[in-house]
Amino acid sequence: MSKQEPVIKVSSEVGRLRRLLVHSPDSGLGKVVPSKAQDWLFEDIVHLETIRKKEYDFYTKLLLYFLDPGLILGKLKNIDAEKNKRNFYKPEHKEFFRSDKVIELQWLLAEILEDLEIRLKMAASVCAIENCSYDTQKELLNLHPVALAKTFITGTLESDRMLFAPIPNFIFTRDIGIVINEYVLLNKPAKKARTREALIAKYIFFNHPFFKAYQENILELNDGYHHFLLPKESDDRKVTLEGGDVMVVTKDHLLIGVSERTTMEAAHQTIQLLFERNIVKKITVIKIPKKRDYMHIDTVFTQIRRDAWVMLGVFSKKSMKHENEDSVQRALEGSKKDEKLKIIQFRKKDIENPVSFDNLEDLLTEISKEDLQCSGKIKFIYSGNNEFPFDAREQWTDSCNLLALKEGVVLGYDRNDKTTEAFKENGFQILHAHDLIRQLEEGSLNVEQIGRAHV
């Protein structure tokens, strides 16, 4: 790792990806049962080997080719040989790839658990959260750090005995914390099922040598005064924030979603904290309907280039205008505050005079033109190609939730056919992961040659 290269720095949603935290699908995903799907916030009953071998392994390969090619280029035949039993992809195995660019959280956890003091504190904390017996706590302390890290995440011992619930959402690593320039804002999950994730993330960020130089740059939100006295219906006054509701569009401009998982009070506290620390100059709060369909703002829009965005059409200018012109609908639904889009922008130098936007397209256009100095027409690619019912169906299966490997090159799911058509119609090349990996491995293509593409 270069001494000049910062470990932590994010000032764009579409800049060249250098490092990211990941977590491989663990055995806990295979323990999810229908009766606990709502409680554990994981509604898919997955076939574990399928999502590992036919989905996540391909994702890992692509990340390594783009971020850490020395670990994979020219070695894939041996890595994927049947005799090696996927050991390259298993975080607990000695043959695991252990990249310092594609960074596995389970390994970071195992490394900090080598410290006895941390091991004692974490075992006590996890057992308190999960209401375990003292005997269980002692049993955990007898485990090797690698095995203990795995159990903290999966909830299961090597013997396959379950001690407590899995945390299947740990694979969504964006939610555990947000990098804003050279700062890390830790999350405060809205649901109890994600409390253990937040605890693990906190211990890693505050204790792993990888983040040692950034201890003063780790930010946490505090619960409000007498928060424990708030009635359940006062949800907006509670402080909950998840990473899917925060986007760093430029070094000076942050977007915060107020959603099913992130509260207005959390947005308020984040604005105060970031402005006081001079971390950004402008923050836009995007209040979306509190619906499971949307969950976070990154499920309804994502930036794919400085001048291009993918989004759900119901928040477009045309759709919002039609809704506002329908006087009957407006009269009937006027009181449904939680079902309306609201966008307010605050500037540190003029915080008393916030600016409002009527629709998402106007905000995103301003970001591209004013913040990012784009002079041409701003492109909007719509979920499901803006066709009913495909727009809603494909948004549910993450058509708007993409990962930019570099500007104009994004990773998405192959199941969203209509959205893929929309990308193609807007000049993007559609690349299938299997074919792209083959070309990268044989040398007929390199990552620098890939321009505008949906993978």
Located regions from the model:
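The feature marks the mature, well-folded catalytic cores of soluble enzymes
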Residues: S2-R452
